Amino acid sequence: ATRLAKTSKAVRENLKFPDIIGLQEVENLGALQSLATRISTDAIANAQPDPLYAAYLVEGNDVGGIDVGYLVKTAVVSGVTPRVTVNSVVQEDAGELFVNPDASTELLNDRPNLRLMATVNFAGGQTSAITLVNVHLRSLNSVGATTPGSNGWLTDGERVRAKRQKQAESLANLVQARQVGSAAERILVLGDYNAFEVNDGFGHSFGVIRGVPVPDNETAVPGDGVDLVNPDLTDLATTLPVAQRYSYTFDGNAQ
């Protein structure tokens, strides 16, 4: 209940009721629906407009049971027209495989990317189509580990770096395929990249996803200097004041 209350307050008072919210580390659809209900209840109690969020989530592959999902505002803007019309929700590449050096395989995407295609409606009758891809990529845990690896990997760190790179390439290829399919499609990639916006030396997965990789010899991951996205994606964090360009505080350090 405390978490629901805090998240509801953040959505209402800090985020100001966004039209679409991408969420990560959600237990299941029921939990997301509970959050949507709590936001509505709190909004009404505080004399705020009820956003009538609809929840969308598809179960993924994570052993801990966490998934990515969306809250979409369906409050009416005119007549019976909702603020956002959801056209499709698709889980991408849930069965894609990660190949180890010994030729054994495992699922690449523990939390597969979730694509939502929607139309935002305005009171005056105008509409705007948008495609969102909600991501939660492999963490940085053990990225520099030197402990002996398995399945043909020399170290555990080598495996982590390779998996992070392959996830970045998979997402970049997804974005590029959609750009090639329709140059006019507005694509927004959001979520938890578990990556810095700069090259950290281990790898630069964020740059790979955006289409601005660093030269191969500047990271510990072989073969990551290939540009897979054209035109490049824009890092919207750069539109914020410098002091606000962080999404997490780790041991007192904003990052």
Each model region followed by its residue ranges:
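Divalent cation-coordinating acidic motifs and surrounding scaffolds
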Residues: 1-255
